[in-house]
Each structure stands twice: as structure tokens, then as C-alpha cells.
Curated annotation (Swiss-Prot):
Its EC number is 2.7.4.6. Belongs to the NDK family. ATP binds at K9, F57, R85, T91, R102, N112. It comes from Trichlorobacter lovleyi (strain ATCC BAA-1151 / DSM 17278 / SZ) (Geobacter lovleyi). The keyword Metal-binding applies. The gene is ndk. Gene3D superfamilies: Nucleoside diphosphate kinase-like domain. This is Nucleoside diphosphate kinase. It is an enzyme of class 2 (transferase). The active site is at H115 (pros-phosphohistidine intermediate). Pfam families: NDK. PROSITE patterns: NDPK, NDPK_LIKE. HAMAP family: NDP_kinase.
Amino acid sequence: MERTFAIIKPDAVERGLSGKIITKIEEAGFAIVGMKKIHLSRAQAEGFYYVHKERPFFNDLCSFMSRSPVIVMCLQKENAIADWRTLMGATNPANAEPGTIRKEFAKNIEENSSHGSDAPETAAFEIPYFFNSFELVG
């Protein structure tokens, strides 16, 4: 079994879409082995997105991610990383396939409702950034 990291971003939480997104996750066969609602500080957002520090969108991204609560999750299933990225859809919701989370729930490329690890190495950083081993069940 593989684990991946997922975030329901502020834009989706603010609009009350968390339950619908969680339902899609479970219907796709993922086990949610860790989940909590948190409000990231600016420093936490900067630490999490440090790989984008030199990118022009870094400040806006960190402001967005720390503006209101998010739901962080550790998801588990065979091929979890690729399957979660497929379920999320393209980063730009205009390019996302019908039925994907971003096509259904994202507002735009910046407020695209969800985040997911893009590789095993990324998941290995992202999961323990938010969860200790006692918080993961399954």
C-alpha cells in the first residue's frame, strides 16, 4: 500500500465543499488514515511550500494557504500518489477532466481546491510535516 498527502485548500473549505471532496476520495477507494482541520500560519505555509520559494507565485500562494483553515489528509491505497493526482485533475481547472475535483470545485488556477504529493519523495516530506506516526491509523 502507498500513502500520499492531500490538502483541501481554503477556497473549498470556505465554500463548504469539504464533505463532497471527502466523499469523492472515499468513493475512489482511498482509505483516509489521517485527517485534521488546521489553520496554517504564514511560517507553516512558507515551510511547506519552500520548494517554490524562488517562484514568482510563492508569496501569493503562502498568503492564500494561510488565509483560512484547510483540511490535511494522509490517503492510502495501491498507487495512491498517481491515483490522487488523477482524481484531483489538472492544476488549471480549465484543463481538468470532467468528474475531477478541480473541474467540479476549483475557482481558478490559484484557488484550485486541492493539493497532492507529486512523488514518493514529496509524500515522504509532506506527510510528517503535518502528522506524527500516532496520528496515522491504518
